[in-house]
């Protein structure tokens, strides 16, 4: 059972949650002065239109027609499926639906904001985009966006994933991007981390630092970010806006679930539904799932911290493990991040979103079960959501109650098979930090 919308139903506007948050965000701070940052400084890092979107109080922002055509080209609208085989396998009265972002040409949700960021950079006359990537999904998406819009792309890929997922690197290179393992010898930041540990596995925080250092050396370059900031999460709301329309063909969800690293795929599905809760129109349960190896939501502190490991970015008020937190080399590379989207942090603080965490072994076990039932191999990141869905469906079975579950299957795992191989061979290790000193 599935619903596929026609091209003409691609959303015409993104949803911006800022005007609807239960409290306003605290302003980002200048890393040098610790005062609210001058917006003009952000324009040296990001494309100007993205800076405007980041602080906009408009509830809906129009998606340019040219960009909607590109969305169609890469596979939007994406399908929404009912997981009937999984329901039968679990023997649950719950009905399970998933929005499948793996149907895009790059295999994940990341292309939704990659195209938007590249589009606005091109309009401004920017020639080169530089970014970080964890598992490689974001780097792949920006590489294709650059190819489609005529921009050069350079990607700093967390070294653990660079080694675990060599074909992601190959795919980025096919699309024309330069790819460096991070930490690298390409930047002063990278050299410093390599001096501390020549075999450093890297992290999203370190890769962000390298990308920003790179950008600041080139006036014609700008930084593109794959998660965390509001404009990135806003671009992803095409997922939830489509899903709301598709679920009208089925039924109203009770529970909405997504995995979380920085927060973009969770927000993409959930925020259009969160609006209904904030407006008092509906009651949904929102579950955000993270790895126990990077327990930002479940064990982090809500405070100002840098978005990168070297302290080059503005400080954001968010849930954080501390920007120098050593993130273990789990296979869900896209979730190896110390911080969290400020907007999602606020929703967690107000009890609107419930966070939970799992070990990677139990996550891969759930992913294999899902693959056997539905035929789709989830990305290791998305598999965290699958684990939560299965647990919720089993809860419904124990309590003998009907329940409608909607989750975001944010990407496929066909280029992440080393993690699955390690799981099947009994080689996966679980990581959970004992102490989490946060130094902002």
Curated annotation (Swiss-Prot):
It comes from the Archaea. GO terms for molecular function: L-serine hydro-lyase (adding indole, L-tryptophan-forming) activity; pyridoxal phosphate binding; tryptophan synthase activity. Its EC number is 4.2.1.20. Keywords: Amino-acid biosynthesis, Aromatic amino acid biosynthesis, Lyase, Pyridoxal phosphate, Tryptophan biosynthesis. SUPFAM superfamilies: Tryptophan synthase beta subunit-like PLP-dependent enzymes. InterPro entries: Trp_synth_b-like, Trp_synth_b_CS, Trp_synth_beta, Trp_synth_beta/beta-like, TrpB-like_PALP, TrpB-like_PALP_sf. It is an enzyme of class 4 (lyase). Pathway: Amino-acid biosynthesis; L-tryptophan biosynthesis; L-tryptophan from chorismate: step 5/5. GO terms for cellular component: cytoplasm. The modification N6-(pyridoxal phosphate)lysine is found at residue 110. It catalyses: (1S,2R)-1-C-(indol-3-yl)glycerol 3-phosphate + L-serine = D-glyceraldehyde 3-phosphate + L-tryptophan + H2O. Its cofactor is pyridoxal 5'-phosphate. Tetramer of two alpha and two beta chains. The beta subunit is responsible for the synthesis of L-tryptophan from indole and L-serine. Belongs to the TrpB family. This is Tryptophan synthase beta chain 2.
